[in-house]
Swiss-Prot record:
E.C. numbers: 3.1.3.2
Species whose genome carries this gene: Arabidopsis thaliana (Mouse-ear cress)
Signal sequence segment: 1-31
The encoding gene: PAP4
Lineage: Eukaryota, Viridiplantae, Streptophyta, Embryophyta, Tracheophyta
Protein name: Purple acid phosphatase 4
Sequence similarity: Belongs to the metallophosphoesterase superfamily. Purple acid phosphatase family.
Length: 339
């Protein structure tokens, strides 16, 4: 009787062990966005610059914008730089050996203050070339600043930045690409790819304990410039951002600088797409009370974050401050509950 019980118990234990091993080896039903840890300053603060639509071999005032970025970056002692995409014009990189990487990036952003990590998303022009070239770790071995992924998180403790690959959301690139060719090799099947992005983003935002949440994408959710609002992002992405109390959405794509804040959404919509060629003279916005700032020239943006305050400044090609916006949040220590 005793030996039968021992054999039976052993059988149950072995069965449970096999089940545990199979479960541990099985793929997770919910994947997670890759996360890069970026330590804040000793006081918990961070500061960074935001530039978009820039890679033109230094032309169209790219070099002048880079010079002023270096000056402002030194004054602020920035921690890193954010790129909102369209890193290499006109058609991305042809290969890992494309000289455009050096001519549009390494040889342009040479100021000492800009020798910090650059966190980059892809834009639609980047998708016109070899996407894997921009994503390759070989580029980082050539220039250690370059950190480019499709979608990922930068965790700076006080703030988390969620980088989203927005180009595959836009129907027109698939339905009517005209004479353009896009590299969708890492995107198909599209429906599954987009759902994965949305699921992982929603999970990351929901689980984030950061004081400030910022989302970065190439395409604008709201814009008064040539491309206007991106309807696919308004319907698919915006509800997730609003439900998870995102503070800022930062983008490029439209070659301008703008700040939109609507009564329908608590999110600040910030466009920094003036890294080189700008689009002068185009403006289409019907609710002037929502447009806090619009500039149809070249420039960039800075962000400074502390435990209780966030400050955004837009600069032109000469480094002049054009627009500033500040907000604040209560510190945890400010909440007092009497016994």
């Amino acid at each position: 009787m005793s030996s039968k019980f021992d054999i039976g118990s052993l059988s149950i234990v072995m069965t449970l062990l096999i089940c545990f091993l199979l479960l541990s080896l099985a793929p997770k039903l919910e994947a997670e966005l890759a996360t890069v840890q970026h330590a804040p300053n000793p006081d918990g603060s961070i500061s960074f610059l935001v530039i978009g639509d820039w890679g033109r071999h230094g032309l169209y005032n790219q070099s002048q914008v880079a010079l002023q970025m270096g000056r402002i970056g030194e004054e602020m002692d920035i921690n890193f730089v954010v790129s909102t995409g369209d890193n290499i014009y006109d058609n991305g990189m042809k290969s890992i050996d494309d000289p455009a990487f050096q001519l549009s990036f390494s040889n342009i952003y040479t100021s000492p203050s800009l020798q910090k990590p650059w966190y980059l998303v892809l834009g639609n022009h980047d998708y016109r070339g070899d996407v894997e070239a921009q994503l390759s770790p070989i580029l980082r071995s050539m220039d250690s600043r370059w950190i480019c992924m499709r979608s990922f998180i930068v965790d700076a403790e006080i703030a988390e930045l969620f980088f989203v690959d927005t180009t595959p959301f836009v129907d027109a690139y698939f339905l009517s690409p005209q004479d353009q060719t896009y590299d969708w090799s890492g995107v198909s099947p599209r429906k599954s790819y987009l759902q994965t992005i949305l699921t992982e983003l929603e999970m990351g935002l929901r689980e984030s304990s950061a004081k400030w949440k910022i989302v970065v994408g190439h395409h604008a959710i709201k814009s008064a410039s040539i491309h206007g609002n991106t309807k696919e992002l308004e319907s698919l992405l915006l509800p997730i951002l609003e439900a998870n109390k995102v503070d800022l959405y930062m983008n490029g794509h439209d070659h301008c600088l703008q700040h939109i804040s609507t009564s329908q959404s608590p999110i600040q919509f910030l466009t920094s797409g003036g890294g080189s060629k700008a689009w002068r003279g185009y403006y289409n916005w019907t609710t002037p009370e929502d447009m806090k700032f619009f500039y149809d020239g070249q420039g960039f943006m800075s962000v400074k974050i502390t435990r209780s305050e966030l400050s955004v400044v837009f600069y032109d090609v000469s480094g002049n401050s054009l627009h500033k916006w500040d907000t604040s949040k209560m510190l945890d220590s400010d909440f007092y509950f009497p016994l």
